[in-house]
Structures are given as C-alpha cells and as structure tokens.
Amino acid sequence: MITSFKLSKQKKITHGFFNRNGGKSDGIYKSLNCGPGSHDKRNKVIENLRIVKNKICKKTKNIVLLHQIHSKKILFIDKNFRFNKKKVKADAIITGQKKIPIAVLTADCVPI
C-alpha cells in the first residue's frame, strides 16, 4: 500500500493507493486484481478486495466499488447507506461516514 504524506496528516481518514503487487490472482491476472468486471476467477477477485479492505479498515465486511460510466454522477454515502450486491453506476464517491471503505478502480487513469 502506498500512502500520501499530506493525506497521512489527516487523522480522521485512512487511505491507500495499491498497485498490482501482493494479490491472489494467477495466470494472466497474476496481480492484486480487484476488478469484478474482469474475467478473473470471482473468488480471487474477492480475496484481493479483502486484502485491500483489511489494509484500509478491518472493522467492516464490505468495500464500496462503483461501476464507472464516465459521467458526472457522484455517489454520496450518508448514514442511511446500505450495502447491496449491485454496484452503483457513478464515477466518484464522497462520504463522511466512518468504517465504510470506498474504492475507485483505475487502469490507465489517475485517481483524484
């Protein structure tokens, strides 16, 4: 996990940037592949997401991912947010809620 010196000064947030190293996937996906839309084995993607989630927040079961659609749509997570298995279609996540890890998957894009 790579961290930002400036973001690390913020005591109320935990953050991290992950590269392809340290994952459970094998074959052509041999990496920390967290992309449920890939053709990787589902159980490997779930294990990789668990690795990421545990490094960010061990006290929760889930991590919020988006189905990115290259739009202006933003997901706002508030106290009424409920996890479900269907990914939300949006391109950004904002939350002030504790213990709800959020993630944006990127390939050739730079996360902001």
Model-derived features with residue positions:
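Active-site microenvironment for binding and transforming phosphate-containing groups
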Residues: 1-112
